[in-house]
Amino acid sequence: MANHSSAKKAARQTVKKTLVNKRRASAIKTFVKKVLHEINQGNKEEANSALVIAQSKIMQGVKKNIIKLNTASRKISKLSKKIKTMN
């Protein structure tokens, strides 16, 4: 347990920031799942619109240091590729 007041404050801040980061990461995963769901359903237009939203959320995650840039680029690339290969 922290003894100094500054260490106690840092511990409190860590708890708050962890919750916010988990919430943001969960939101990113949810939007990616929506895109994958639309791809599996075969709705190309719906998948494209969901991809635009997912790209935005993924890049916001990069900006907030939730995920790394290369990871975000890979996710967006894979989703885009799946949509392009749809009939």
Curated annotation (Swiss-Prot):
GO (cellular component) term, any one: small ribosomal subunit
GO biological process, one term: translation
Gene3D superfamilies, per database record: Ribosomal protein S20 (1.20.58.110)
Keyword rRNA-binding in record: yes
Statement: the UniProt record of this protein carries the keyword Nucleotide-binding: no
A Pfam family reported for this protein in Swiss-Prot or TrEMBL: Ribosomal_S20p
Gene Ontology MF term list: small ribosomal subunit rRNA binding; structural constituent of ribosome
Protein task: Binds directly to 16S ribosomal RNA.
UniProt xrefs under PANTHER family: 30S RIBOSOMAL PROTEIN S20 (PTHR33398), SMALL RIBOSOMAL SUBUNIT PROTEIN BS20C (PTHR33398:SF1)
Family: Belongs to the bacterial ribosomal protein bS20 family.
Protein name as annotated: Small ribosomal subunit protein bS20
Organism (species): Rickettsia bellii (strain OSU 85-389)
Name of the encoding gene: rpsT
